[in-house]
């Protein structure tokens, strides 16, 4: 899953396993006896607070498109028993393609989040989720694979966004890694032996000619070798 997230544009981060007790939704918090600071006083029950801090840090440094993920353990207590859960969490915020002349006004939405989840774990299903501490109650979904609950996703709640001083909408997912079984019938494509080649193409066309039609013609004549087209400028 980590490799798949990197391929579709996510960057991996690593955060402390300690968070503020304000971001815990249980009474069975695992308190740290001598915390290094108040905002690192309990063992984390989710990776999302750390990722939210990453988003806040990057947005304050003029990063307009953010797609991050983290893979790690969360820590829980059930009565006297302490146990760990392996989690993979991803988060996205900002513009989908800030350098693209056409797409630079499009911001990430929940549909982009769902598409990313489906690209790394096909055949998952989504159901409404009303009981999450981290997600907005009207924009939260549970993730199922073969009728098994494997995680949740949605738009981060406004209260949590305010805690981290984030203005743009933030979307995230958390997946229980141990509940995912690999498909034995999965098919794999051979990786190309040739390096990627980037080309700048200048086209002179009538003003009435639609750009999307031009892109479509280029795609159809690329013999499936071309992976992506971006419009850099119009003059």
Please give the residue ranges for each predicted region:
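Short, hydrophobic beta-strand segments
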Residues: 1, 31-35, 84-104, 140-144, ...
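Hydrophobic alpha-helical scaffolding
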Residues: 4, 37-45, 61, 80-81, ...
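Conserved alpha/beta core surface patches that mediate binding of polyanionic ligands
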Residues: 13, 45-91, 169-184, 223-235
């Amino acid at each position: 899953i980590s490799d798949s997230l990197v391929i579709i544009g996510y960057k991996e981060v690593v955060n402390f396993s300690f968070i503020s007790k304000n971001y815990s939704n249980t009474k069975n918090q695992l308190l740290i006896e001598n915390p290094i600071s108040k905002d690192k006083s309990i063992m984390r029950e989710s990776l999302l607070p750390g990722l939210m801090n990453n988003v806040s840090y990057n947005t304050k440094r003029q990063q307009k498109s953010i797609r991050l993920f983290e893979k790690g353990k969360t820590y829980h207590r059930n009565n006297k028993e302490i146990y760990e859960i392996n989690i993979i969490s991803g988060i996205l915020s900002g513009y989908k393609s800030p350098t693209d002349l056409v797409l630079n006004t499009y911001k990430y939405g929940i549909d982009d989040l769902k598409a990313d989840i489906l690209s790394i774990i096909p055949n998952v299903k989504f159901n409404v989720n009303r009981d999450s501490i981290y997600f907005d109650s009207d924009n939260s979904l549970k993730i199922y694979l073969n009728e098994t609950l494997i995680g949740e996703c949605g738009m981060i709640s406004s209260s949590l966004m305010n805690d981290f001083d984030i203005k743009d909408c933030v979307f995230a997912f958390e997946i229980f890694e141990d509940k995912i079984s690999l498909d034995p019938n999965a098919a794999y494509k051979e990786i190309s032996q040739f390096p990627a080649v980037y080309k700048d193409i200048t086209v002179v066309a009538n003003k009435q000619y639609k750009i999307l039609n031009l892109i479509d013609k280029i795609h159809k004549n690329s013999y499936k070798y071309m992976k992506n087209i971006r419009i850099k400028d119009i003059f």
